[in-house]
């Protein structure tokens, strides 16, 4: 953690200079991976929001920081990142342990597998996180064939593209309902 302490100290010293250059630009801190207390302190000091990933939430730990009831308003919630499976792929019964699927069902009120993506979206939009971000592949409910990136591989990464007509009026209506219902303007 010595390197993190030093890095955090350097950022504190440079924060005013950074703010002078970027002005009102919004920064989201990628605070994923190994927990380091200095990173948490840095986020508190700078006010930069951290990331919460719903795909990381259902490990069985009821105090997992990625569970929506653990979010703070100063956070940004994602379904997954560009390095994760799509929500459809991630929540397939064959990809998860039975207890994990049961926890997801109980937590989000899922009664059928085909409801999971809609429930994940609703849960994220209803959370206290200040910002909600989902990949288009998740809005469109696409399987892992549309995954953006698979770390440690080469060849088919960063190739998925949305085609004209993929985003339907039903998708738009659902997103509009989420934004309106949960006051995310």
Residue ranges and their predicted role:
Residues 1-8, 12:
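Single conserved hydrophobic/aromatic residue that forms the stacking wall/gate
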Residues 1-2, 17-18, 66-67, 122:
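Short, flexible, glycine/charge-rich loop motifs used to bind or transfer phosphoryl groups or to couple energy/partner
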Residues 6, 46, 51, 152-161:
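Acidic, Ser/Thr-rich peripheral helices and adjacent loops at domain boundaries
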Residues 13-22:
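Alpha-helix-loop-beta-strand connector modules within alpha/beta enzyme cores
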Residues 23-25, 31-144:
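Conserved alpha/beta catalytic core and glycan-binding cleft of carbohydrate-active enzymes
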Residues 141-185:
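Structured C-terminal cap/extension of enzyme domains
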């Amino acid at each position: 953690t010595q390197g993190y302490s030093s890095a955090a100290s350097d950022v504190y010293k440079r924060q005013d200079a950074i703010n002078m250059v970027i002005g009102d630009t919004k920064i989201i801190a990628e605070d994923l991976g190994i927990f380091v207390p200095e990173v948490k302190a840095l986020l508190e000091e700078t006010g930069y929001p951290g990331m919460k990933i719903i795909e990381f939430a259902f490990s069985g730990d009821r105090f997992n920081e990625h569970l929506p009831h653990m979010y703070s308003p100063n956070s940004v919630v994602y379904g997954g990142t560009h390095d994760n499976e799509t929500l459809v792929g991630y929540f397939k019964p064959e990809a998860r342990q039975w207890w994990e699927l049961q926890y997801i069902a109980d937590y989000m009120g899922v009664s059928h597998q085909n409801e999971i993506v809609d429930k994940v979206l609703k849960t994220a939009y209803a959370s206290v996180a200040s910002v909600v971000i989902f990949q288009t592949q998740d809005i469109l409910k696409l399987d892992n064939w549309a995954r953006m990136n698979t770390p440690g591989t080469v060849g088919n990464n960063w190739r998925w593209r949305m085609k004209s007509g993929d985003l339907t009026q039903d998708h738009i209506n659902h997103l509009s309902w989420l934004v309106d219902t949960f006051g995310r303007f």
